[in-house]
Amino acid sequence: MIEFDNLTYLHGKPQGTGLLKANPEDFVVVEDLGFEPDGEGEHILVRILKNGCNTRFVADALAKFLKIHAREVSFAGQKDKHAVTEQWLCARVPGKEMPDLSAFQLEGCQVLEYARHKRKLRLGALKGNAFTLVLREVSNRDDVEQRLIDICVKGVPNYFGAQRFGIGGSNLQGALRWAQTNTPVRDRNKRSFWLSAARSALFNQIVAERLKKADVNQVVDGDALQLAGRGSWFVATTEELAELQRRVNDKELMITAALPGSGEWGTQREALAFEQAAVAEETELQTLLVREKVEAARRAMLLYPQQLSWNWWDDVTVEIRFWLPAGSFATSVVRELINTTGDYAHIAE
C-alpha cells in the first residue's frame, strides 16, 4: 500500500515548504448546506461559530443546554477542532415554544442564528464548504504562484486526506488487523472508521497509479464517467471516446475511480483491468470490504476547487480562498502547493 505522503502528485512534488495552520485563524471553514431552514417543524437548526472546539463536544454541550439526549443533536459533517469554523447543528425539540439559544454559552463558541426546520440534519447532508487558508513561511513564492495558476486549470487529485486513516494510520492498521481475522468488531464507530479507511486507501492507490500516466485525463475504453456535480455515472465505449474526451476537457464530465467493495466496480474492459491491477496486491482489504458487504461505488478522480482566489500579504504569506463539494479535502489542495510543516489534519465532509 502506498503511504499517503508518497501518493503521486498531479503537478509534481512542490519545490517549497510552508506552514499550515500556524494558528486556528489561519484555517477558516464555512459550511454550506445548500438550503435554508424551513422556519417551522420539530427540529431547530443552529448555526454556530466555533474556535478550538470539536463538533461532537459542541453537540453534546448543546444537548445538555436543551435538556435533551445527545442523540437528538445531529450535524452534517465533522469540523476540525484546530480551526475557525461555521457549521450547523440540528436539535430535535418538539413543541411551539422556541428556546432562547442566544443564552447558550460555551468557551470558543457563538450562536450566530437559529430557526425551526422540518427534517433532521443527517451526516453528509451538505453541499460543501468554503475555505479561507493562510500559508505562512512560504519558501518559494514563484513555485506556489504557478501551482495556483495550474490548479485553476487542471485541478488536484481527489485523494482522501491523511486524517481519514487516523493518527499514524491507526484506522488503516485496524482495518488490516481485522481483515486478517474473522473476529467480529462490535464497536460501530471502529467498524465505520476501519471500513472507510480501507476503501479510501484503495481509491487513493488507484488514483495514484492513474496519475502516473502521461495524460491522466485521457478517457479509455470502459472508463466510468460522471456528470460534474452528480453521483450517477456511465461507461465509456470505444465509439464515443472522441466526444467523451471533449466533454471531459470541458469539465462537463469527470473520470471516476473505484471505491472498491462488493458488487461490480463500474468500469469495464481496459479501465477495469487497470483498476484491478492497481490494487491487485491489496487482497486482504478487498476481501474485508466484500465480507462486510460494503458496496462498491465511484468517486471523481480529480477535484476542481471552485471560486479559487489568492492574495499575497507579503513574499512569504499567502491567503487562499476556495469552495469544495462535500466529501472533499482541503489538504488535497494544499498538498499540491507546498510541503507543509505543522498540523496537516482537516476534513471537509
Curated annotation (Swiss-Prot):
GO terms for biological process: tRNA pseudouridine synthesis. It is an enzyme of class 5 (isomerase). SUPFAM superfamilies: Pseudouridine synthase. The active site is at D80 (nucleophile). Keywords: Isomerase, tRNA processing. Residues 155-303 form the TRUD domain. It catalyses: uridine(13) in tRNA = pseudouridine(13) in tRNA. Pfam families: TruD. Its EC number is 5.4.99.27. One of its GO terms (molecular function) is RNA binding. GO terms for cellular component: cytosol. Substrate binds at F27, N129, F329. CDD domains: PseudoU_synth_EcTruD. Belongs to the pseudouridine synthase TruD family. Responsible for synthesis of pseudouridine from uracil-13 in transfer RNAs. This is tRNA pseudouridine synthase D. It comes from Escherichia coli O6:H1 (strain CFT073 / ATCC 700928 / UPEC). The lineage of its organism: Bacteria, Pseudomonadati, Pseudomonadota, Gammaproteobacteria, Enterobacterales. The gene is truD.
